[in-house]
């Protein structure tokens, strides 16, 4: 692959390094193949291996972390937003669900997508599945953790994040916007 190496120094002392090796995944698309890191002057160690990327845009589909843990990603909303992160599963495990979830994310019924994402979580009991939905052109709408607890994101009429609620409807965070008058 083609490496990109970043080294960090403080007062002339090497704190660490990161090497990202790029690969041509087809059609001239260069995307990461490996990420290696080190602390101080120790040798670089492989931390992430990219097993599969989307050849149309370079989004990671399956990566393997140090220790062998596989993490898969399903991209929706015309492959622009992450809709599912699946830890402890391979692409072969998630592939049967991918096209349907992507199609549902392009529809207008968010609840149908949420139900399908929850079905993915149920279908992969040994995986940790985190799912996401979005309000197009606004921002994230829901995040559901591996236990199935959903946080919802609420926006004001200007598309600004107003508050975040937990699964019980409790407000976790709130944003207030104040304007200064101009003189």
Describe each region flagged by the PLM.
Residues 1-65, 69-145, 150-183:
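Beta-strand elements of repeat-based all-beta scaffolds
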